[in-house]
């Protein structure tokens, strides 16, 4: 029960009155590993380290503790927040962002209640350290279960995605990805670039890893000629001579040491994935120790050491211990390792985006919010939930968004007069019902297109004004609107608008438009306000972006104008 007279409400009142902070209720508890505090009922504590976990689910928190113990991964702290009657995500993000013993933060979220506080704290934390978030309830049934669990409204998952992106958080979609991220964050410091070299004693494994890397948006490193020359001197003549670096199935430990040392020294390499396939000629432990030796030597020579990710097939506790001592992240599969690598790349890109200076808006962009508010207040004073079409044009024009002109006509004769004026400069006009109660006009035949004479306009208006009131007797009908037909032989139909989310508030929507917009479902969301860079990023996340460039006899769309329109809408 979360109502005003619930036990949770009484608990909050006592906490406010006494100055006591409360974690929970309905939670696993709290751990601070460095101070040896264990105020939880977890089966066992995790080892001390520098990864913080904040979880809305006690079961997920318990699972992460058990996984951390099994993988020798240390935690700086763990808080199971439960129903968050007092202490919430924002409080804990603020704490761990300033905690010198925490290098990265993992969040498990089912719902958010104070969106503005959360986003502010998340943005501040993501600027200084990686923040990984897994959000359950991506589908309707799961979101409903999460809302029942936490007593909070879940909101649309696409809006959560937009909020996480704007705050610089790195989202993953399941606990397996959380584990991969935690393995990486616990042992790898942030690095520059995304050029990965793949080192392996099995050629097929290397080829599969390249496919996986490119699928995730990564980039294979191109070995420098001098690196290839040095490797030629130390490897058998049948090595691959390129990336992936196949050092051949009979590779002994020294071959792993030599090849990794030269690869790490290459300025065109940002990180290395080292993989080992067990053979009768090559033991896993010996190769692992050789890799650990090369990594230690590399770290001793530079402050900005390049990360090395390890995949040893046929893993054993002995191998885990070798990698843990060397602070190398080991993974069961190349897919897990590549996800971990790309998560670090994506976090760095998100952090860089948070730190950049937004581009200036055009000097002639001078919005008139007061004019827009007048139109909206008029609708509110009349108890309406929708603006009519002319009011919408008024609001958009106040923010510099160009709209096709239109005229409201209350009779067929007025419509004919408006059509006659438009037909002087346009080949055809359109007539639509004017009603704040009818949103999908074409569904009921309330749109007439390609009208080329005043008589045709008059007849279309008469038909609409006679027929639609019978179909929708409860709808308030102001008349019809007359518009010039805008014909673009190579035009693309797009949608741009503002939605309202119950958790995060206004969101900007962009995507493919048209009557089938819901069926096609090609849209992306972003939190306002936008600048030009953010608007271009929003456009790039849609499939329709691919057809906005020039192709065959179709000219390119004006991407800067589309982006500027989104910026104006977001204001």
How would you label these PLM feature ranges?
Residues 1-571:
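Catalytic-core regions of core metabolic enzymes
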């Amino acid at each position: 029960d979360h109502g005003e007279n619930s036990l949770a409400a009484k608990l909050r009142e006592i906490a406010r009155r006494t100055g006591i902070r409360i974690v929970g209720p309905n939670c696993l508890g709290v751990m601070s590993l460095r101070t040896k505090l264990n105020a939880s009922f977890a089966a066992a504590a995790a080892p001390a380290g520098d990864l913080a976990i904040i979880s809305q689910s006690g079961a997920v928190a318990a699972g992460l503790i058990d996984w951390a113990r099994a993988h020798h991964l240390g935690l700086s702290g763990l808080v199971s927040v439960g129903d968050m009657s007092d202490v919430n995500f924002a409080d804990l993000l603020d704490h761990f962002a300033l905690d010198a013993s925490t290098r990265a933060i993992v969040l498990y979220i089912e719902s958010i209640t104070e969106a503005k506080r959360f986003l502010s704290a998340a943005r501040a934390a993501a600027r200084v350290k990686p923040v990984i978030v897994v959000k359950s309830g991506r589908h309707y049934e799961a979101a409903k279960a999460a809302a029942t669990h936490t007593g909070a409204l879940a909101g649309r998952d696409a809006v959560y995605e937009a909020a996480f992106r704007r705050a610089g958080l790195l989202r993953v979609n399941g606990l397996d990805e959380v584990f991969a991220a935690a393995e990486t964050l616990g042992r790898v410091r942030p690095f520059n670039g995304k050029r990965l070299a793949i080192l392996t004693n099995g050629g097929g494994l290397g080829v599969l890893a390249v496919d996986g890397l490119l699928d995730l948006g990564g980039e294979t490193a191109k070995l420098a000629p001098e690196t290839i020359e040095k490797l030629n001197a130390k490897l058998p003549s049948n090595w691959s001579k390129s990336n992936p670096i196949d050092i051949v199935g009979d590779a002994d430990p020294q071959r792993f040491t030599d090849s990794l040392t030269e690869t790490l020294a290459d300025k065109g390499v940002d990180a290395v994935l080292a993989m080992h396939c067990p053979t009768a000629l090559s033991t896993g432990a010996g190769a692992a120790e050789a890799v650990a030796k090369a990594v230690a030597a590399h770290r001793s020579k530079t402050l900005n050491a390049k990360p090395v990710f390890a995949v040893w097939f046929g893993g054993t506790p002995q191998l885990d211990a070798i990698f843990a001592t060397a602070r190398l992240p080991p993974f069961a599969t190349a897919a897990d390792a590549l996800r971990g690598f790309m998560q670090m790349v994506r976090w760095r890109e998100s952090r860089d985006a948070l730190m950049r200076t937004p581009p200036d808006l055009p000097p002639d962009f001078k919005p008139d919010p007061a004019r827009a508010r007048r139109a909206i207040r008029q609708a509110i004073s009349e108890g309406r939930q929708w603006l009519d079409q002319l009011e919408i044009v008024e609001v958009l024009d106040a923010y510099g968004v160009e709209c096709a002109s239109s005229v409201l006509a209350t009779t067929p004769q007025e419509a004919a007069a408006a059509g006659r004026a438009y037909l002087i400069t346009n080949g055809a006009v359109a007539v639509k019902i004017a009603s704040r109660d009818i949103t999908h006009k074409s569904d009921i035949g309330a749109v007439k297109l390609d009208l080329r004479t005043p008589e045709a306009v008059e007849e279309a208006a008469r038909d609409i004004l006679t027929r639609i009131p019978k179909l929708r007797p409860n709808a308030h009908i102001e008349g019809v609107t007359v518009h010039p037909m805008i014909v673009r032989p190579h035009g693309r139909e797009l949608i741009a608008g503002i939605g309202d989310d119950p958790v995060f508030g206004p969101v900007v929507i962009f995507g493919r438009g048209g009557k089938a917009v819901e069926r096609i479902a090609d849209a992306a969301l972003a939190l306002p306000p936008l600048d030009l860079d953010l608007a271009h990023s929003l456009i790039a996340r849609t499939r329709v972006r691919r057809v906005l460039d020039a192709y065959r006899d179709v000219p390119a769309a004006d991407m800067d104008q589309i982006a500027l329109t989104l910026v104006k809408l977001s204001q």
